Amino acid sequence: PRITYSPAPGKETDPGEVVWTWVPYEEDHREGKDRPVLIIGRDHEWLLGLLLTSKDHDRDAVQEARSGRRWMDIGTGEWDPQRRPSEVRINRIIRIDPDDVRRIGAVLDRDIFDDVAAAVRA
């Protein structure tokens, strides 16, 4: 996908922002949970996002790689009220209905966003 960085003040969700939305589980798309997502672009009316977690996957990197999940550290941000370090999953892009975005949590730093974009493209 075309990855862009264009956060702008206002109510619209823009690439480069971390938002909260419902994310389906991979193993059963009928179930999921509310979590932070980094918006990386658009696909017509859909938003494209990468899920975030505060779980440290460096500890289970071998298992995650074996399962086909790739993670990248992005540090802390206002999307997490406890300011815990976060990781972004770089090999699962999620399509999100803009109406399903619950709130905008923060804008990700441009340099970190560019690093994430490069990792997604790799």
Language-model features and meaning:
Residues 1-35, 39-122:
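Conserved functional hotspots at enzyme active or ligand-binding sites that engage polyanionic ligands
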